[in-house]
Amino acid sequence: MSSECDGGSKAVMNGLAPGSNGQDKATADPLRARSISAVKIIPVKTVKNASGLVLPTDMDLTKICTGKGAVTLRASSSYRETPSSSPASPQETRQHESKPGLEPEPSSADEWRLSSSADANGNAQPSSLAAKGYRSVHPNLPSDKSQDATSSSAAQPEVIVVPLYLVNTDRGQEGTARPPTPLGPLGCVPTIPATASAASPLTFPTLDDFIPPHLQRWPHHSQPARASGSFAPISQTPPSFSPPPPLVPPAPEDLRRVSEPDLTGAVSSTDSSPLLNEVSSSLIGTDSQAFPSVSKPSSAYPSTTIVNPTIVLLQHNREQQKRLSSLSDPVSERRVGEQDSAPTQEKPTSPGKAIEKRAKDDSRRVVKSTQDLSDVSMDEVGIPLRNTERSKDWYKTMFKQIHKLNRDTPEENPYFPTYKFPELPEIQQTSEEDNPYTPTYQFPASTPSPKSEDDDSDLYSPRYSFSEDTKSPLSVPRSKSEMSYIDGEKVVKRSATLPLPARSSSLKSSSERNDWEPPDKKVDTRKYRAEPKSIYEYQPGKSSVLTNEKMSRDISPEEIDLKNEPWYKFFSELEFGKPPPKKIWDYTPGDCSILPREDRKTNLDKDLSLCQTELEADLEKMETLNKAPSANVPQSSAISPTPEISSETPGYIYSSNFHAVKRESDGAPGDLTSLENERQIYKSVLEGGDIPLQGLSGLKRPSSSASTKDSESPRHFIPADYLESTEEFIRRRHDDKEKLLADQRRLKREQEEADIAARRHTGVIPTHHQFITNERFGDLLNIDDTAKRKSGSEMRPARAKFDFKAQTLKELPLQKGDIVYIYKQIDQNWYEGEHHGRVGIFPRTYIELLPPAEKAQPKKLTPVQVLEYGEAIAKFNFNGDTQVEMSFRKGERITLLRQVDENWYEGRIPGTSRQGIFPITYVDVIKRPLVKNPVDYMDLPFSSSPSRSATASPQFSSHSKLITPAPSSLPHSRRALSPEMHAVTSEWISLTVGVPGRRSLALTPPLPPLPEASIYNTDHLALSPRASPSLSLSLPHLSWSDRPTPRSVASPLALPSPHKTYSLAPTSQASLHMNGDGGVHTPSSGIHQDSFLQLPLGSSDSVISQLSDAFSSQSKRQPWREESGQYERKAERGAGERGPGGPKISKKSCLKPSDVVRCLSTEQRLSDLNTPEESRPGKPLGSAFPGSEAEQTERHRGGEQAGRKAARRGGSQQPQAQQRRVTPDRSQTSQDLFSYQALYSYIPQNDDELELRDGDIVDVMEKCDDGWFVGTSRRTKQFGTFPGNYVKPLYL
């Protein structure tokens, strides 16, 4: 290969200073530098010999390189060296002579490529291009194109003709020390005879010749090393050239195109020497790496054959470009070259990557040889020439070239190149006013590598193309004035700033970083990517990158979504008369982009402090106006910057609900729609408020007749005298906020209620007062309902249409015709209300609302047909809270008329007119009334009205003193059964097996009950001989048919013989009365003490302790009875048991051992040792079985009651009370409600839930409306909630 040709072409082709690439041609001998006055493109399709070239007359044929079209480079005589100063080195001359058979053109092309690889910043072009994967391709031109060159005289400018299809040799070859594989003769420069070489050496001027040494970064001695990678001998030219011109010449884009394989033939034919100055200057100022060959080692674009459209395109532009070049001035051309070169630069890569890719390219080039000569042919502006074989790749490359974006630092005008030249602060900014031509189409100068934009390869190629115009960036053709402005500021701005670190900063030296590269590979680079829009839609002054980087605040997702919503765009055009803002970051506080742009600019220019001062002054004016309204209406004191009284006195001014203002026709700068107003409007719109009727843009139009501060307020006209003061405005705004807050609280409350309703069973804690827990209704129950309940206006009356039987304690039982007062509606199905002083919930379908005008009168029911009146004795004083309640004093005898519900009786006091209802717990029921068609009430033995006030009864007087674990401590005290103990869980009960601490002097309305029959008449108590063989109690002739139930943990007790009976002193005796709810109470009267068997006082403690031990031992010996509900056992009877033929009475054995010992006092057990006639078995306990129930009822009605004596009151009424509650219909009995057996196992999901296993017996205390039950497991003694569909009622 001809090293001469290579050396010369290298110097000129890329237009870069080889010294910047570390090549020291210029440094070696600055005299070698010469100026190229013109670049001529000679489109010769086929150049067989030198004679076929159309050459200028002044061209030196010895300086000609021919090819498929040639570029003639004329060395200007102004910078031309003497012929003697440019002799070829003997080495190079010998090389030419010794290699006649080798293709001179590839060597020339390679040398040019080496020159192009030199970077003005010192970046090694080979490494940069190698990092991009570009492969230089060699045109496969016949070697017979060699020309006989004759040396021209030294006086005429040197003309260097280079083929249009000079292609950079493989970068990989640069990395190797051997010359590239011969690719066939290209005929660039024929083997030049020694004489020709001596006379006029072919060592062409390199760009180092035109670059001052102080601008060449890389050590000049490194050029031979780099050049020697492929053409070591060729790359070194003797130091025979003239010194470089003082002007720092940017390399011409045109020459760079000539030097680039991908820009093959892209050399613009220019005749002016200023173009060369521009060329060299721009190449100094830009990285030559911007022009790599298209192909990468791993590129998806394989080589394509060279096609003639390139030549056609060159011919098309040659004349225009020649004229433009001749008209351009050197400095402006240089600056434009800088501008245009930066965008087309490809990303530099780290030296390591460059070396690897060069090695790859080298190996690939060795293999592919000639087929890679034109990997992707490029036309003059960098567009790859289409090839039928690679049409898809061609389309891809074309699309990316068309849609490239200009890369700029966001802070500056997007039309300024982002690459900075700190070394060139002295570059003047002169505009090219003399370029009248703007091409109608623009193409990028180079084809970026396929990965340059897609896969975030190391760097992005710059986005400014080398167009023929050399002044317009890639995006759009520019007018002359616009380009002048851009070119004028470009160099200064870039030189004044430092480059930003490249994304691959860790792999590059700082000298290889360009600030037009994305910051870092890990940084989101979407803003650097091309948008899918045509480049012709690009508008000056618009840059998405610029606006994106200018965001000075965080944008909320709502704002960003706002502009993207199609409905918003549509309504924006309707409301504002124009499309919505392009970018959401136009929405800045105090600056609403919806408003007209010119208005926004005006307001932004205002001084905020001035506006504040003016507003304050205006507010004072408004206050004065409102205080002393006069005929003269001040002109918009909040608007005009200098408040003044208008000479005209309009009767009305435009106003909103919150502010009354009058806008001057000239739109004074201090108007109410200042920054603060915009901020309010903006916030209102973003928060979902309505857009003002005339749109936000109407608020700031100078011609607008009015303004409003609140975007949601309806506009109307009001008299000027009624303008609101600032205080009123603030107050109304505050009221609106409070209203909004109230709405939010209500919504929150409803949400909480919904959440609570979803799991109403959680946290159920039975309470004496209100069974509807706060957890269920949330904040609604925080309101004091007592006042509402006292006032009739707050409670709406309703009448029950059907009988409603309560299934849980929180439900309110109703009979048809009852009048209830509704407090509130719980949900769509349930009301909460009050009936006869009791509060509860009931279904709305069971009642009918009464009209407010209608007086709430209960329906006249058919009179209750009382078959037999009952009898009771008052145990406590009772003061009725309502008119329907009857007050009485302790000890009074009450005639029972009927049982209103499970907790209330209706009765009257004989001899008086007092009649009403009263709670069962306040009386000892001696005899139950018999009525026709009695109502079956749920058997809740220890329930009472939850709404009963504390004044009606001595509540909780001894609640904390009911139980003591030491029975012996109170041997002589009179103990009473306390129902409250049944509200605690079984686990607690098991810990309190002792006898009650002292007698309960006053019983309270009980807690929600445990199941029925947990307390029994002590007539039926017996000690098991196994548990206490030494002690027996003489009891009536009763045998137990014991079927254990979920609550029974003890075996039946044997009835001991009567000879074990003891007598008790009359003072320690008490008659035993069972009240309606199963409680055993000791009345104050001792009239029946003579009828009781008596025991020695000293034995009471032992009896209790024996009972406790008996129950405990039985529960331990027979644990299977907890789970079994199917076994019956006959109680062992005492030896002296009377009435052996007495009927066996079935009972519900729901009594736990701890319950009995805990709930029964000594006196109660003794008092149950009645005389035989008082404890006859004919007094049933209320069997759980329908059959026994019928039997009991029959006996009861058969005349037992008629023959009853007063002495029998204590024991005989209990069976009646029990049997009355138990009917053949088992659906509502307490046992059904409160004793359940688990069908499935249940694993708790929350802390308050109860674990169930298949077959577990659970004592249910409450059923929640959501289907969950609350109860205690017999097996685990744990208390909690569980799903109701996991259990089934346990029938005994």
UniProtKB/Swiss-Prot annotation:
The lineage of its organism: Eukaryota, Metazoa, Chordata, Craniata, Vertebrata. One of its GO terms (cellular component) is nucleus. Changing T237A: Has a protective role in both obesity and diabetes. Interacts (via third SH3 domain) with the Ten-1 ICD form of TENM1; the interaction induces the translocation of SORBS1 to the nucleus. Interacts with INSM1. Interacts with the long isoform of AFDN and with VCL. AFDN and VCL bind to SORBS1 in a competitive manner and do not form a ternary complex. Interacts with ABL1, CBL, CBLB and INPPL1/SHIP2 through the third SH3 domain. Interaction with ABL1 occurs only after insulin stimulation while this has no effect on the interaction with INPPL1. Interacts with the insulin receptor but dissociates from it following insulin stimulation. It comes from the Eukaryota. The keyword Membrane applies. The modification Phosphotyrosine is found at Y536, Y654, Y937, Y1240. Detected in skeletal muscle (at protein level). Widely expressed with highest levels in heart and skeletal muscle. Keywords: Cell junction, Cell membrane, Cytoplasm, Cytoskeleton, Glycoprotein, Membrane, Nucleus, Phosphoprotein, Repeat, SH3 domain, Transport. The keyword Nucleus applies. It comes from Homo sapiens (Human). Residues 74-89, 944-954 have a biased composition (Low complexity). One of its GO terms (biological process) is cellular response to insulin stimulus. Residues 793-852, 867-928, 1231-1292 form the SH3 domain. The modification Phosphothreonine is found at T82, T344, T708, T862. This is Sorbin and SH3 domain-containing protein 1. It is found in: Cell junction, Adherens junction; Cell membrane; Cytoplasm, Cytoskeleton; Cell junction, Focal adhesion. PANTHER family: SH3 DOMAIN-CONTAINING, SORBIN AND SH3 DOMAIN-CONTAINING PROTEIN 1. Residues 114-128, 266-275, 437-450, 955-971, 1106-1117, 1162-1172, 1211-1230 have a biased composition (Polar residues). Residues 366-469 form the SoHo domain. Its main location: other. Plays a role in tyrosine phosphorylation of CBL by linking CBL to the insulin receptor. Required for insulin-stimulated glucose transport. Involved in formation of actin stress fibers and focal adhesions. The modification Phosphoserine is found at residues 86, 89, 242, 259, 341, 350, 369, 374, 465, 472, 481, 556, 609, 640, 665, 713, 945, 953. It holds the Pfam family SH3_9. Residues 240-252 have a biased composition (Pro residues). Residues 1-29, 73-158, 214-275, 318-381, 405-534, 628-650, 692-716, 944-976, 1041-1064, 1106-1150, 1162-1230 are annotated as: Disordered.
